[in-house]
A protein has these predicted regions:
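...captures the hydrophobic TM-helix bundle architecture rather than a specific catalytic motif
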Residues: 2-197
Length: 197
């Protein structure tokens, strides 16, 4: 009698539900890193603005009172800085192309997009080094120089991690591990973060 009641109850059981969505811990972790990096960079820029606001006033060549925060002998090379800004936009396009190729299971295009992203990241690092060399100032030459190297050095470190992320993700694409697109999406998110800050 007991066997009969057990078979009856199992025949009336509900079917199993749908499988839960796969967890995208890489994407969540990258989002957390991007949020922390954004807070870091905006905190550093807030300190920069506070430093600039606390600088003494002087009369400009036009007769207006301005903050004397940038030493007169320092000139920021605009070509290298504008080139760096433009290359960051290209890196975002290439990172998104890698996501697009991954969703279509196209390993060769995903690999090429990631290689170009890494190359463009290296170009941005090169542009920052060119800015350092053209400006020709030392880290301890004054408060402006120290703040400049602190902010740009932090961004340079973030760029190096972006290039490393691109290379590791590229090796994953070369191996044909394109089943989960969350790694590529996390990679693209990181490059969006780098471009935004």
């Amino acid at each position: 009698c007991l066997e009969r009641s057990m078979s009856t109850t199992t025949s009336h059981a509900l079917p199993s539900g749908a499988q839960p969505a796969p967890r995208s811990s890489v994407l969540v972790a990258t989002s957390a890193v991007a949020a922390a990096g954004t807070m870091l960079m905006f905190g550093m820029l807030a300190m920069w603005l506070k430093f600039r606001d606390a600088s003494p006033l002087r009369e400009s060549a036009r007769g207006k009172m301005i903050h004397d925060w940038l030493p007169s002998e320092i000139k920021v090379p605009e070509v290298a800085t504008n080139t760096m800004a433009f290359t960051m936009v290209i890196a975002c396009v290439m990172a998104q192309w890698a996501v697009y190729s991954t969703r279509r299971n196209d390993s060769s295009h995903a690999t090429m997009a990631l290689a170009v992203t890494a190359f463009v990241g290296i170009a941005a690092i090169n542009a920052q080094v060119a800015v350092y060399l053209q400006m020709g100032m030392g880290l301890t030459d004054g408060p402006y120089q120290t703040m400049f190297y602190a902010v740009t050095g932090t961004m340079l470190a973030l760029l190096v991690t972006g290039v490393a992320f691109s290379i590791v993700t590229m090796f994953r694409a070369v191996a044909g591990r394109l089943g989960d697109s969350s790694v590529m999406s996390a990679h693209a998110l990181y490059w969006y973060f780098l471009t935004a800050v």
